[in-house]
Amino acid sequence: NRTAGRRSGRASQRLGKRAEEAVRLALQAAGFRMIERVATPWTVTFHRGRPKAAFPTAKVSGDFRAVEPGTGRSVLVEVKCRSGRLRWSDLRPHQRQALDEHHRLGGISILAWVTGWEVRLLRWPVEEFGPGKTLKSSAP
């Protein structure tokens, strides 16, 4: 059962990998350095010696970490891949909390929104984006 506008399974994973690579390149073009993907820890269960299931063990603070040259400030990036609109509810509570806390502690928090047409690096907190709000893509 798919939610409207969202992909599932392998197609979603392929799209996510392409989006993450586009974000990495956009961060590099914006001048950030030491850009690293944050690895999600996984747990694998076995049945009779064979893998049965895999699931994320813990929530991570974001999708990428980087450093701002010149200042050495920490950069935390959360990536969202949505066409047309990005809803506040597309961000999970722990993702919003991590972006908020990182910003509050003096780091640079970025919401990277990937549409089919563009990568937008939005500085957190994003103006006029909050509970019940939606951002609209500038792409046609």
Q: What annotation goes with each model-predicted range?
A:
Residues R82-H102:
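Mg2+/Mn2+-dependent nuclease catalytic core
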Residues G62-G84:
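Conserved catalytic cores of phosphodiester-cleaving nucleases, focusing on short active-site segments
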Residues D100-F129:
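Nucleic-acid nuclease catalytic cores
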Residues N1-P56:
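Acidic-basic catalytic patches of nuclease active cores, encompassing PD-(D/E)XK
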